[in-house]
A protein has these predicted regions:
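General nucleic-acid-binding
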Residues: 1-26
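Short alpha-helical segments that sit at the start of domains
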Residues: 28-55
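Short amphipathic alpha-helical interface segments
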Residues: 51-65
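Glycine-centered, phosphate/nucleic-acid-interacting loop/turn motifs that mediate DNA/RNA or nucleotide
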Residues: 93
């Protein structure tokens, strides 16, 4: 089964409603598998998902990196910039870091924005 994450542009209230909905489903014994990341505005989402960061995500999804240094070398990019990108993506929940390793836990990312 593929792991997916859904990106949203929304308010804390929107995020809270999704949380409460998931909580109630868990209370009823339902399994809750969806993952969500909410950004306060479109600019924040686009800042987190620059073309270079998307390239990094795709690369790490294909092959997890043993370290940020190894990832920077593999991508042919400056270590400092790759480190910044990894930190931003990890803070957004789109990358995982464990014991120095960098991995992308999701197979698909979808985005939703209300007008």
């Amino acid at each position: 089964m593929s792991k997916r994450v859904k990106l949203h542009v929304g308010t804390r209230e929107d995020m809270g409603k999704r949380f409460v909905s998931a909580w109630h489903r868990l209370e009823r014994g339902e399994r809750v598998r969806e993952r969500h990341v909410t950004f306060p505005d479109l600019a924040s989402m686009l800042n987190a998902l620059t073309p270079k960061r998307l390239e990094l995500l795709r690369d790490v999804h294909r092959e997890p990196a043993p370290s940020v240094k190894a990832l920077a070398e593999r991508l042919g990019r400056d270590y400092k910039r790759v480190h910044e990108d990894v930190e931003t993506l990890a803070a957004s929940g789109l990358l995982q870091r464990e014991d120095g390793r960098v991995s992308a836990p999701y197979d698909a990312i979808t985005a939703e924005m209300r007008l």
